UniProtKB/Swiss-Prot annotation:
Domain of life: Bacteria
Record-level GO cellular component terms: cytosol
Region (Argininosuccinate lyase), start-end ranges: 1-466
Protein name: Bifunctional protein ArgH
Originating organism: Vibrio parahaemolyticus serotype O3:K6 (strain RIMD 2210633)
Amino acid sequence: MALWGGRFTQAADTRFKEFNDSLRFDYRLAEQDIVGSIAWSKALLSVGVLSAEEQQKLELALNELKLEVMEDPHQILRSDAEDIHSWVEQQLISKVGDLGKKLHTGRSRNDQVATDLKLWCRQQGQQLLIALDRLQSQMVQVAKQHQGTVLPGYTHLQRAQPVTFAHWCLAYVEMFERDYSRLSDALQRLDTCPLGSGALAGTAYPIDREQLAHNLGFHRATRNSLDSVSDRDHVMELMSVASISMLHLSRLAEDMIFYNSGESNFIELADTVTSGSSLMPQKKNPDALELIRGKTGRVYGALAGMMMTVKALPLAYNKDMQEDKEGLFDALDTWNDCMEMAALCFDGIKVNGERTLEAAKQGYANATELADYLVAKGIPFREAHHIVGVAVVGAIAKGCALEELSLQELQEFSDVIDNDVYDILTIESCLEKRSALGGVSPKQVAYAVDQADKRLAQRDSSAVKVRPARLTDIETLEGMVAYWANMGENLPRSRNELVRDIGSFAVAEHHGEVTGCASLYVYDSGLAEIRSLGIEAGWQGQGQGSAIVNYLVDKARQMAIKKVFVLTRTPEFFMKQSFLPTSKSLLPEKVLKDCDQCPRQHACDEVALEINLVEQIIQRSHVA
């Protein structure tokens, strides 16, 4: 079903239809399209286009469709729909009949796709932040283990000065820190909602676009309808961030390939990230790293292609803009995969400390120390530089290191050299002297490792903000609880109940907007239940639920509660939070009284899980 048939008297040529259709790649926006449609149905309700009964019917059908898509996303590809918007509308009409045709009132595919894409970018961006964090954390852990492992530092691929393996790791941690910052900034800039901008001139209905934006989890609505449907800055910015980060990953891969080579033999990669040769049985090839290096080009290509596509477009939507998605999807998928592989390479890495130390002692890497020694004796640096250069030539001629020259031989180059020169030519001295901030001295490296560890820990603690609920949150809580109750995931709660139990609720926040909630209901037996866990549409899969559950479990622990349980149809989620399966028959009868309100009470498919806080305390005390 096309969404634009009335103007045409002839059917589209099948070759044009195949050329024009985008469902084969924009099917990835299905969840976002459904979430956006639910929010739009609420907006239409607010201006009287839909009745409350119609809106509820549409929302239930869209939620059903969302679950179907989550279970089998590839079912979409079996359709001949033009794009994901057409497919969603087709499915909706098949569920609710002509009512489904009312949903597109006041909305254009132009603002619809712009909204879908921003929702997808926001969700994918959060996953990329997590991937960056994991990679940095893995590298910091390796750095902790190798603070004293000496490594030759290179310039022009020539041995230059000794560093440590930890210092080398932290150099890339800094690069990825900048990537994290750039991505965070990009996500803030795209945190505006274009829905309600229509085709280009805005919607003709008096919709509260700020409320609509907040319902979708955006910070605010966009300010200009023409810009809203024209804008693809966020696509190019995310590709740009990906390109810079892939550059860092490629440089990392190149370093590790060199260090892993037989000529260097500084590191050995695990079998899990290497492959062999079909002909040469001795080979162990660093394929994961080579692919990271190779895939960098495709991300650059996607960015260049997108910029060339947009550079001469007039304002508003043009069909050229359909080309934004394939490159974006591929670029961000590639970036995510490469970060995962890089972290995996560090997971099983072995560092040959003896070999790295041996290499660091070669190549006259202590020549700069001798020059600094001469400067300390009163010789101008430029002259000292020349003297040491001549000394290096002399040592090369004798086939020895600088520190292996006798005092008499060294004094042939400068008579200010004395016996104390040998102390400053050691590797330990070379490292120790670099004690300024950011240097390679043991103290500075230990400080840098500690600071990196603290930054990552602070980031983890502030990624999702959870706080006690307030009465000012009631409107949002009521909407979220009703949403998941309609989905059949939670029991319904009246507004009066929510007000009465507000002290038991915790909420997650994003830019001051509530994005998730749950309550901790305490029984008089020292037992507590997590209830009414729900995440705002568009925010699932971004750590909100985990953060709320952990917050409530910590609260229960502080209250000396012995056990926390939950009844759920998604046991996998709670098992990731350390909950274990239990039997519903072991729960007190009064726990199950609320089941009388459940529409599925006669065909219950909920699973009981629990976390025993007393056992955790005992285990921790044994460890201590």
